[in-house]
Amino acid sequence: MPSLVGSEMCIRDSTKSLFQTRSIPTNDIEMTIAFYEKLGFEIAFRTVNEAADEKVAFLKLGTLVIETYENKAAALKPGAIDHVAIDVKNIEKVHEMITGAGLNTTQDEVHFLPFWENGVRFFTIEGPNKEKVEFSQYL
């Protein structure tokens, strides 16, 4: 499997930061927001993912952003974080690199959600431990 670090098309050159968000499913978004607000987080953005009928909130403390979404199916046990997201500059280029390196094991395509001011484009792959790694670009 080709490496994406040290190659001509380096993924490091395509990212904006190490991690963009950590995503936590919840059964009660208001309780989750209240908990993180007590820890000093502020609501950075709040919306509804109408396609999935889920309330969504992005909570920010410094450079850490937690995305929480109410899906009524949260595991409520350790290991319940759904995915990590990596912020990229050019989603199409990164998708091409990941797919070309044989890392797009889910065969996921680039999707769009109307989050934030202009939306976000993203795709998700699966790591060797079944963890989800999302690559996303704010528009």
Question: Which residues fall in each region the model found?
Answer:
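Single conserved hydrophobic/aromatic residue that forms the stacking wall/gate
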Residues: 1-13
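Short, solvent-exposed beta-strand edge segments and adjacent coil->beta transition regions
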Residues: 17-21, 79-83, 120
